[in-house]
Amino acid sequence: MFAPLGLFRDIPCPQREECSLIACLFSHRDLNSAPAAQDQVLEQKEPAKLPPKRLKLEPRPEAKETPKDDLRHVSDSGRSTPVKKTTAPATNAENISPVSRQPNIPKNTATAPIKRELNANTGSSIPPRRAPKEALNPRMIQKSPATYNVRMAILKKLHGTLCSLNDQLAKDKALEDKCLILTPDELITMALDEEEKVAKESPTVYSNVVKLRIVKLSRMSKEDWAKELKDYLNKKYYKIKAEPVQKEPKPFKTDLSVEEEIAVASQLITPLQGLEDFGYVTRVPTAEEIEIAKRGVAEAKGWEKCERCNARFQVFPGRREDGTLTSGGTCTYHPGKSFYPPRKKTDHITGTMREGYFTCCNQKLGESSGCTTGATHVYKVSETKRLASILQFEKTPENPDLHNPTPICFDCEMGYTTLGMELIRLTAVSWPEGKKVLDVLVRPLGEVLDLNSRFSGVFPEHYTNALPYSTAPTKSSAPSSSSPSQLQLVSSPAAARTLLFNLLTPSTPLIGHAIDNDLNACRIIHPTVIDTAILYPHPGGGLPYRMSLRTLAKKHLDREIQTGGASGKQGHDSVEDALATGDLVRVKAGLVWGRLKEKGWIVEEGRLVAPDSSSNTVSMQTKLGEGAGAKRAREGTS
């Protein structure tokens, strides 16, 4: 239609390699010259394809463009290695060709060495930044919030403010992270990103938002600018996921005194009678039951079902002749639980299919056999008589030497061995103060298959660095999250159980979450327990469904716990879990005491005293009732 004037043919294309136009108005000459120059240099580096006489003819006219310093190096190298007329060594061709092609290198590649140098000074393994070369020109969007002149004026002001902050960092000699100093291209890109973001997100108040942003940047300190710049660079270039920051839990406070909390705890005791079907052990297995369990294990010849992938495999306690502990090879499984998204009433209208997925990898159920591979298969023993065949249960003995014992919160960590899932760490803290009174590593009875470090937080190096347990009394410490590498090691689960018995009497409240698992791991039968899994029943009807400790801590304490288990790098911390369990009981104790106080109850000498007229009535109201599911089942059958 019209003859092109070529007014933009000398201007580099702003889109560079990403330009998709067939006949672009801008120049792409610099983009194509660099690869061509590199190809020519590579071609000259191949001595087999070069005729011997070309070495004399071609370098001379191009040597005029070479700087004097470079010519001096070339001449010196020529004197050290004389060139014969008949042959041309390949080394001389390599020395001359880069010098002759140096003027053809595009100018826009001069910023690359700067970025590499800045990143190298940090000493980190972050990838190099590759900012596109853009003009300081507002980016085109579908609906512009202002005229071009207004956007251009604001963009220049924003760019100038960013340059000023960047110059302050560049002049700071004490700056350790030199990679925070931006190149001119990166400053332009950052200004364009800031302006474009406001133009898209706040078009109606575009001018005010950008001006406030410029004022905030101009008043920002170097420390705040460096922090904000790190977040921007990570999102823009590095895309490195930040490790979860574990915050120190805030101490939980109530309006009750320690004496009042301990007194109210007597109203929160969980009766275990009738809960045997849910894993709670209330009596010691007999010798006949243990013998039956041993015969069953002998007849099975070591064949078990994998706890993770449900595969059948054979386990060899004490090792097989060739040193093998298990058969079946490696185990491929999903460490996370399966999750089904809640359905909506409009799903049948919209046709939405909500399929279940695994929380560890977000894969749909049935897509793969697993996302994690374990060295061996593992299994867990849940039958009471078989647990007793490995280590017999014991009831909490009387302890006449222990006067006025305080309630104890305890938590156990378990790992997989050739005998099933065994105790590997035991932690106990006082309640309600939360002082640590016992925290030891435990050497299991069987050979270790998997320490279950993703959840237990115990790694092999913790056993390597552990010291034998000392009977010397240890000072109670403030609530803290100790590393297992600092713990002492006891010889067996029975030894750990004895240490816990030294802190208890049969009437001492023992507090835990899903306490049946911890009691069974220690082989303890304790008559006075407070289980937060029953204290806070599941909305689905109570047992066998249970709310996780992490969910309860977030809901009632506004506390994030067990954050190390997501990545598998740290795992859970039994001290953290024990403290959270104790604080959940304190929350419930405060609610119960509020109702008791309204009824006229008081605390005298560490005991609850009921009013004379309605002591029995109020006492029954404060005790825990049966779950909602049991109530509905009873009402439906009657």
From Swiss-Prot:
Keywords of this entry: Cytoplasm, Exonuclease, Hydrolase, Nuclease, Nucleus, rRNA processing
GO-annotated molecular function: exonuclease activity; nucleic acid binding
Compositionally skewed regions (Polar residues) per UniProt: 77-111, 612-622
Gene3D superfamilies: Ribonuclease H-like superfamily/Ribonuclease H (3.30.420.10)
GO terms of biological process kind: rRNA 3'-end processing
Domain of life: Eukaryota
Region entry Disordered, spans: 37-136, 612-638
Primary site of residence: cytoplasm
Subcellular location: Cytoplasm; Nucleus
Bias kind Basic and acidic residues: ranges: 55-76
EC number, as in UniProt: 3.1.-.-
Occurrences of domain Exonuclease (ranges): 408-584
One term under GO cellular component: cytoplasm
SUPFAM superfamilies the UniProt entry points to: Ribonuclease H-like
Keyword Ribonucleoprotein: no
Task performed by this protein: 3' to 5' exoribonuclease required for proper 3' end maturation of MRP RNA and of the U5L snRNA.
Family membership noted in the UniProt record: Belongs to the REXO1/REXO3 family.
Identification of the protein by name: RNA exonuclease 3
Organism for this UniProt entry: Emericella nidulans (strain FGSC A4 / ATCC 38163 / CBS 112.46 / NRRL 194 / M139)
Organism lineage string: Eukaryota, Fungi, Dikarya, Ascomycota, Pezizomycotina
